[in-house]
Amino acid sequence: MASQGTKRSYEQMETDGERQNATEIRASVGKMIDGIGRFYIQMCTELKLSDYEGRLIQNSLTVERMVLSAFDERRNRYLEEHPSAGKDPKKTGGPIYKRVGGRWMRELVLYDKEEIRRIWRQANNGDDATRGLTHMMIWHSNLNDTTYQRTRALVRTGMDPRMCSLMQGSTLPRRSGAAGAAVKGIGTMVMELIRMIKRGINDRNFWRGENGRKTRSAYERMCNILKGKFQTAAQRAMMDQVRESRNPGNAEIEDLIFSARSALILRGSVAHKSCLPACVYGPAVSSGYDFEKEGYSLVGIDPFKLLQNSQVYSLIRPNENPAHKSQLVWMACHSAAFEDLRLLSFIRGTKVSPRGKLSTRGVQIASNENMDTMESSTLELRSRYWAIRTRSGGNTNQQRASAGQISVQPTFSVQRNLPFEKSTVMAAFTGNTEGRTSDMRAEIIRMMEGAKPEEVSFRGRGVFELSDEKATNPIVPSFDMSNEGSYFFGDNAEEYDN
């Protein structure tokens, strides 16, 4: 594991980051959660939502989106400079669902962005509370990761749909800051860099002039973030090469795709945080729980305990399975879209199925969907055990799947062997070891050749009973190896469309 001396913990990324002790970090994260909760309570009052309606996850998503849009300065500026028909750049809104006369009705609400900003700041002691906004962005990103497979985006950038386990955070907005960068997968960073290089190839002014200097420094910063996620010297050296290139072009794209493929076996460190919807924090705050005083962590038992005691509802379409909808949201809450399903089933205490076997579409309801046939049901978000989130790739001291996903990106720090289909991964590495990065490529391939899927990662780490808050008695799970480990297994999940 890379020396962590230079890295800040997530919580420091979540906070404004001077070194803090554990208690201060917990209080500071708790304060952020309090702010989201207070904001949500206030919005439910503004919208005149009943308790049940306020706990509806679709209403939560609309409210979260409204505040994110109200604070999206770049887009707000763009909308004011490029007025489009029928869009008021000063307003934000979305669908709010209410129970009227025994059925669900959709109501489109519209608010001044200024008003939403005022309510948000008031809930956050007058601050802009950017951390709380980022927290909601990560929750939306985790929900997208669980709902959609990014096949099309992968293919467009010349990558392979089987690399979907590297795509965590691929829908996070640019403005998500350090906390956002921490949760982005290797493939996400590679894709952002490839898009940038392609623009440079097609537009000769991209790297030039005053703007080009900013572009260049953004490029180098992204390369450094990606380099920091790799755990082997050869992969990092390769990133130095890409970063230092005078004129990034196809050679760099090749190197980036190579390094992304290598991450299927030599996994990068990607942070995982349990970010819950605002409709979980709101009721907890209104019941008198003081997150700042009690302290809160996104990577320990706290989110599990909170979900054990929360009641969240969802709209259900006529042919959807409420249990499947629950699994989708449960996985999103724990940022577990790319974790091994055998492990998730163990932690959750009920079988977790691959995406393609779930009879459920996304959580959001499109504006043209018929509300007459909508029912609602309780989401089952409780778990049997809890486990500590990891930000390492879980590589063994050195370092079986399908046509769909062929590797995992661990979420929980729990002992298991990390399944990957070695022959499938290695088949992608035939031939091309020439060029300036040939020695690094050879070294990376050598390490991958030596990796054994049956080797155990996170040795000795286990899950914990929910009563074991201090994590004193790890329970090391045993797995049925015959079971499929990948969520996007040869899959038919819908595509994510911006």
Swiss-Prot record:
Transferase recorded as keyword: no
Task: Read off the SUPFAM superfamilies from this record.
Answer: flu NP-like (SSF161003)
Subcellular location(s) of the protein: Virion; Host nucleus
Where is composition skewed (Basic and acidic residues) in this entry? 8-21
**A Pfam family this protein belongs to?**
Flu_NP
Print the keywords alphabetically.
Answer: Capsid protein, Helical capsid protein, Host nucleus, Host-virus interaction, Ribonucleoprotein, RNA-binding, Viral nucleoprotein, Viral penetration into host nucleus, Virion, Virus entry into host cell
Q: What is its main location?
A: virion
Kindly state the positions of the motif Bipartite nuclear localization signal in this protein. 198-216
Show where the record puts the motif Unconventional nuclear localization signal. Answer: 1-18
Task: Give this protein's Gene Ontology molecular function annotations.
Answer: RNA binding; structural molecule activity
Can you cite an annotated GO cellular component?
Answer: host cell
Enumerate the Gene Ontology biological process terms.
Answer: symbiont entry into host cell; viral penetration into host nucleus
Q: Where is this region: Disordered?
A: 1-21
As for family, the record states: Belongs to the influenza viruses nucleoprotein family.
Record function comment: Encapsidates the negative strand viral RNA, protecting it from nucleases. The encapsidated genomic RNA is termed the ribonucleoprotein (RNP) and serves as template for transcription and replication. The RNP needs to be localized in the host nucleus to start an infectious cycle, but is too large to diffuse through the nuclear pore complex. NP comprises at least 2 nuclear localization signals that are responsible for the active RNP import into the nucleus through cellular importin alpha/beta pathway.
Complexes and interactors? Homomultimerizes to form the nucleocapsid. May bind host exportin-1/XPO1. Binds to viral genomic RNA. Protein-RNA contacts are mediated by a combination of electrostatic interactions between positively charged residues and the phosphate backbone and planar interactions between aromatic side chains and bases.
Question: What is this protein identified as?
Answer: Nucleoprotein
